[in-house]
Amino acid sequence: MRLNGARAICQSLVEEGVSTIFGLPGGAIMPLYDVLPEFPALHHILVRHEQCAGHMADGYARAAAAIRKPQDQRTVGVCFGTSGPGATNLVTGICNAHMDSVPLVAITANVPNNMIGTDAFQEADITGITIQIGRAHV
């Protein structure tokens, strides 16, 4: 099994104690979905719209915080979205979590690097869009 970006993301999620992910497969993020079966510790919940993924990850982290013991690790909500409209559909959930300091990780795809800034199909500056409502952008 060759380590690639998708496997590195999934392995990192497992190592950080993530067990549940909310998302909707789509074009640019398919490499991540292709390797998910290799990580049985990650339970993916399929949503009908990316906005649901953002809100469900937010709610999941809030609910986990309400029932966790003080010594337990803080549970983070994780959601996936594909490039362009898939990523922008996550924004309301990200903002909602940010407003209440709920730990949420949103992983989105993008167009290939050489196509950024060319108005490529499903290109959106998700970093620029979320700069005010996020702590870190990679």
PLM regions: where:
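N-terminal alpha/beta PP-like core and its mobile active-site loop of ThDP/TPP-dependent enzymes
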Residues: 1-137
